[in-house]
Amino acid sequence: MQVYDRAHELARELSRSSEYNDFRLAKAKLESNATNVDMLRDFRRRQLALEMAVLSGKEPDPADKKALEESYRIISLNPTITAYLEAEQRLARLLADIQKILIDALPEWGKDIIDEVDKK
């Protein structure tokens, strides 16, 4: 039971972290302007479509790549969207770091799968 207690303690600490607080504030500011939300949504839609094409083995359409680059150029000039993306990235980095710490503590977990992949 102590493991679960510690997990809940970690969850509480995460919810009080500066990374999460900064993310929440940046998200609220972003969502206060529908144009910003639409611009970010459009960028992410284009980004996902391009990633899906690559993952399915297709060569991305050059026009789609250009549209994504232009969309990125536009949103990178918007301080509200940029602040949101930076806060989102910092929170994601924190969560990834914590996940790595947890996985590294269990070196045998998943080892058989990794060994099997390495054999191929």
Swiss-Prot record:
Domain of life assignment: Bacteria
HAMAP family (UniProt xref): UPF0342 (MF_01526)
Lineage: Bacteria, Bacillati, Bacillota, Clostridia, Moorellales
Family: Belongs to the UPF0342 family.
Residue intervals passing through the bilayer: none
Stated name of the protein: UPF0342 protein Moth_0821
